[in-house]
Amino acid sequence: MSAYHVGQLVDKMSNPDKDFRFMACNDLMKDLQTGTIALEDDSTAKVIRALIKLLSDSNGEVQNLAIKCIGLLAQPSKIKTHHLEYLVEELTPHVFSKAEQSRDIHSLTLKAMILNLAPSASSNATTTVVKRMLPKFVDSLSLCAPDDAARVDVLDLIGEVLLRFGDVVPEMHKGSLKVMVDHLYSFRSAIRKKAITGIGHLASVINGELYDELVQDLLKELAQRSPPSSAAQNVQLRTLVIALSTVARASGSRFSKHTPKVVPFLLQYLQIDPGTESEHDDLREASIQGLEVFLYRNPQEVVAFEKEVIQQLTDALAYDPNYEYGDDDEDEQMEDDEDDDEDEYSDDEDVTWKVRRAAAKAIEAMISSHRESLLNLSQKIGPVVIGRFKEREETVRTEIISVYIALLNQISILVPDLQKAVVAADEDSIETDDIVVIGGTKFSTNYLSRSQLAIIQSLADQKDVLLRTITKSMKKHPKTGPKCIELLSALIRTYPSGLEDSLDDIIPAVSNILTDKNASAQGKMTVLSFISNALTLNNPKRFKNLLSPLTTIMTHSISEPFYKVSAEGLAVCCKYIDVLRELSACGGNEEAKKLLVVVEKKFMANDTDQEVRERAISAISMLLAAFKDVLKNETPAILEKMTERIGRDMTCLVAFRASTHIVEAGIIFSSAQLQSILRHVVDYVKKIARSLRMTCLNFVEKLMKHSPAGSIPVEELTCVLGEMSNLISETDLQITNQAFCCLTYAFLNFPTCVSLHMQPILDSIIRLLTSPLIQGLALNSLLNLFTAIVKTDFPEKPTFESLLDSVTSPVYDNVALSRHAHMAIASCAAVITESTQNLEKSRSLAKKLAQQLQTANMSDSIRLFAMITLGELGRRVPDTYSPDFPVKPEDLAIKAFNHHHEDLKSAAAQALGALAVGNLNVYLPFILEQIRTQPKKQYLLLHALKEVIVWESSSEESTKSTDLFRSAIVDIWGMLMANAGGNEDGTRSVVAECLGRLCSFDPESLLPKLKESMRSSDPAIRSSAVSAIKYMINDEKRIVDITLQKQIGDFLAAVRDEDLKVRRVALVVLNSAAHNKPALVRDLLPDLLPAVYEETKLRKELIKEVEMGPFKHQVDEGLDLRKCAFECMFTLLESCVDKIDITQFSSVMEVGLSDQNHDVKLLNYLTLQRVANLAPGQVLQRIDRVCEPLKTQLNVRPRGNAVKQEVEKLEELKKAVIRVVYGLKLKLPEVERNPQFLDLYNTIKHTKELEALANDVLKESQRAVVYDTPMETA
């Protein structure tokens, strides 16, 4: 912007017309916001003078814009430092003006400047301005003695400066602190509040000596004024208590050593006799609020007072000296009288409700911060809290209900796998399970520890009283109904079977809340969320007598005008339909008809919200599918509308999903409707939208699978199938897999429609077979497709030979193929051969392949293919290799072991294993004999053996082969143990996997043998033994778990092994167990965790210097071990948090935040976010120590000669830090009061590079939203 334009703006600012002044300020503000203005020195001075003058403008809107403009000028790089100093000099004197308006305007302007200044670490200008500003404010308070109103403004400004830039002016800390402390004793409460706030901001930045002096002075004043003897002393004590609480909140762990000195005073103030000292209620409230702070910030220091704190808080929760509650029965009889009595009291007459509310919040803090005492708290506090649900004040009652919700949330964190531990009545339980019955529900002790069972027992003991009380409260206090529902939702999530016996009472009460005309939309959403959980987590038979109220809930919520409630009602309706289907013989059919009326109305409407329309489409499809016989008359109109919805871009995706559900139920669209739908499919599969293509393919697959012959229009289906060849590609194997499934059903059920496209389809398949990516589900689907092609008769069907030649053409045409591609082609060839069910063709192919394998001039690619295919033929068509057959594939495999081509050697091992899988009786003894006699080929032979063991451990075949295999286990075990101590890591890895899988067959006898090998002096053998345990662990319930749980501790003790590699393997096994089956290791953690923490330390003796040519490079041999330890911590935090001391855990994590390794840092950033979710108080207590390494990382700059990879890694770390900062800001609102965190956050906001990265992080988080959510069917 030119100086001329700036001059014009300045002229307009002094124009007599207020509209000109307003527009000039507005234009300047926009230019400053967008950065389109660059002020020169002279222009800046003119603008500043004009804006200062406008602060006294007669028009309020102009004044407000002037304030905003001055604030924007204070932003980084807008104006020079001396101009900022000038602004401070000009504005500060007006803060002490006797004219109230002038004082307020200039105070707001200075505050706007403070808020816009750059973080001190990145701006010298900020430091200069703050050092000019703060002394003026402090001196004015101590010397000028302005009136009280000015004091409030100045204290507020000092507080803002200290909050954001307290670390910039350490020389002013002592003076600022003295001023703040002096104002603690002012007679004006507003001044006292500002002084307390300022002390809190200072507490987080002052040095240790000044900090201790501050706390000691406050404690001294507290002691001198205790106990209170007058109203004035009450006020002073309350102020001191709040000041100490604020200091503790701001400084966290720094206050720890002072906490034991403060808590006794607070407990003393709570013991004052309420009968004679009712004026102490404000002091009681402040004392309880102080306890809440200490419980969150210094929980370990409060443990010594736990018993007395619980007693005082529970007493305070019931502290209501002005009201007599009476017995419960009496309450019910005198309900109306009681309501009248409540109207007699108001906040002005009775402030005891504040004490009770504070007590509720403090109890919640104790529950959240003392997780290690949760059983004791549940037993002692739980019943008291339930008894206080009768509280007469709504705000207090809401807080009390929140306390029990917090208790349930903490229990759900400590017992996250409760539903897995439930043993259903019809479940085939493992015979040796230890079953514990709690509240009528059977639990397996293999999934729950003793402490977890005790907590669930405590909850079960309180459940009946809780549900009776909460049901009564919902009827008696409709306003707190949604909060009661929130509690019930928490209960059903924590203790899924807890509501089964009480649903008959709860559902009608919930229905009344939803249908109440005064209920809020949020309240209705809460009710529907509870109903959803109840329907999902309870047996449908439990709702047999509740269909009518449930239908009322559904119809009322679906008909709700507010779209959010209506959409949620339709979502819950989908789950209700499942219940109705199970109870169709008990009135479900009639309720379905009622439900259809409201759902169909939403489905047919064209003017509804998009979300409601989509949910209605899903719900109507589920209704039709579940009650197709009952709703026959309504079906045609619905199918016609569904066809219309498919043709619209906004609803086609969800309509296709719904239509898939409909055709799976056997409901038939008319021929005309299918013609329209299939034409749309042809168009949609060509579009970019991946989710739409997949949904279309799924619909076509289910349509062909479930539709009777002649019901699908041939011409349109042929067109759809013609598009399949274009969808077969390595770029998207999921869509390719779906296309293969469609083609399989097409060849089986509609061969004439697909035969026209045989060649394009085959060409696409052959192109795909050259890809190294074809494996897994896509390969399995392709094999099924070839089976369908071979077994189905259709016009111009290719012969066996031509089909085989086409599939194997990439091998013989010398196309460059990966090993995965060779395996895929070999599998296809074997499946095609198997599908012919012609043994002669199989043997002919085997002879041909054997000849190619032995021909000297054959390419390595053909040899590799021949070897794999010979093995696959043995797996799939074992009769090929009869005793009199001249080709001996086992001899060919052994011979291939001597080949120079490594891939051929591996293929031979795999082929030998495949042969044994197909014919265990012949080839397993052969493999074992070779292992005994061929020591130089052990590695390859062990791979062949592993192929057999893996197949047997996962086989669903008859027990014949398994019995045969079991008889050989002893021989196999001996051979494996003989190779467990090899020097090659690959061999030991194979041996470990085989040992682990073998132990699953006979854990009682084999695990002790494996344990004996832990005594070996060879660390390689110990490593193999520990690693074997990893292959015994998965997330399924198996009989091996019982034996493993008893003995796994002996293997995990290797975390203290003298060998580094053994320790690393032990940590990997611990991590695997904690992730897949935490019950195996939960009770061992008190002993194992110290060893895990020990391995997170950086050990300098393990850092070696290696010379690489002219360069020296440092190699950290302990890095892998350190990574494993931190990974283990991360996993344990999710699955075994009940056994973790969060304080000790957080200390180890903090060290990891400063680790030099990129991966370790990223892992600890994730861990920090998880700790913030589970124990927010712990993070708040240590926020200073957390912020320091985060800020250090943000300030790291790449080396001048850094390569691209280094720059990208650094950028990744900075993005991770930004995610952590934003996550902490979202999860912990109080964190914004901390100067260190605020400085960290402002560093991101005011640094261009970091701000750009932050924008990228936000965009990435938005892209991470999953739009392709499946239709709700459960």
From Swiss-Prot:
Database matches in PANTHER family: TIP120
Localization in the cell: Nucleus
Family: Belongs to the CAND family.
Keyword set includes S-adenosyl-L-methionine: no
Function in brief: Key assembly factor of SCF (SKP1-CUL1-F-box protein) E3 ubiquitin ligase complexes that promotes the exchange of the substrate-recognition F-box subunit in SCF complexes, thereby playing a key role in the cellular repertoire of SCF complexes. Acts as a F-box protein exchange factor.
Chief subcellular location: nucleus
Coiled coil (residue ranges): none
A GO CC term assigned to this protein in UniProt: nucleus
Record-given protein name: Cullin-associated NEDD8-dissociated protein 1
Summary of subunit composition and partner proteins: Interacts with cul-1, cul-2, cul-3, cul-4, cul-5 and cul-6.
Pfam families given in the database record: TIP120 (PF08623)
InterPro entries hit by this protein: ARM-like, ARM-type_fold, CAND1/CAND2, TATA-bd_TIP120
Keyword Cytoplasm: no
HEAT repeat spans: 41-79, 127-167, 375-413, 500-540, 617-655, 671-709, 1000-1038, 1041-1078, 1079-1117
Taxonomic lineage from the root: Eukaryota, Metazoa, Ecdysozoa, Nematoda, Chromadorea
Compositional bias ranges of the Acidic residues kind: 325-349
Keywords: Nucleus, Repeat, Ubl conjugation pathway
Top-level lineage group: Eukaryota
Region (Disordered): 320-349
Effect of disrupting the coding gene: Worms show impenetrant phenotypes, including developmental arrest, morphological defects of the vulva and tail and reduced fecundity. Worms also display supernumerary seam cell divisions, defective alae formation, and the accumulation of the SCF(lin-23) target, the glutamate receptor glr-1. Increased levels of the neddylated isoforms of Cul-2 and cul-4.
